[in-house]
Structure formats: C-alpha cells, structure tokens
C-alpha cells in the first residue's frame, strides 16, 4: 500500500540527489574558474585542464582558442566522451551505496574518450580528403 511516508521519502531522496549533484557541479565550476587563472602557457592548455575538471567550461575555453576547427572538435569530443572529473565524482557519489568499482568506471571512461577521439580523428581526416 502506498502511504504518504513512502511518497515523502521518495521526494526527499530525489531532492537530496539533486542537491548533491548540483553541489559537485558548482564545486567543479569554481575549480575550473580557478584553473583558468593558473599561469599556464596559452589558452589552449588552460582549456584542456579546465575540460579535464569540468567539460562545459573546458569546451567553452577551447572554442575560444586559435586552434583549427578540427582540433577544437577533437578536443571537445575527448572532453565530452570522458566527462570530466566532475562527472566521475558525481557518478561515484551516486554509486557510493552500491558495491560498484569507481576504478573500473574511470578506466572505461578513459577508454571511451580514447576511442571516441580516434574515431573522430579518422572521420575528420576522411572528410578533409574528400
């Protein structure tokens, strides 16, 4: 039988999850902003470091570089397919109650990023030679 307690618990669990994820997003957005102020040589390197932390700001930074469009596209593909450390921490937070290995997840995210970048590079090369 569905009671108000079950509904209340479901609502509170949903809010708790959303607040937790929002906290990670805010934390890594702030960390990415700090990383953008590090004395790194060039906007491109800064964009890659920011993208490693948090993909949205990383892609935005890389898009403003003077890199060729193909390199910007490859960088964005790598960032999106990896998901950033922010995404990994969000996933780890959600999997904390399970007995899942975050290490395995990270390995597969890295593999996903490598494969996506390689396939994208092959596609870019193919399209540039048409």
Regions of interest found by a model, annotated:
Residues 1-2, 101:
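Secondary-structure junction/capping motif
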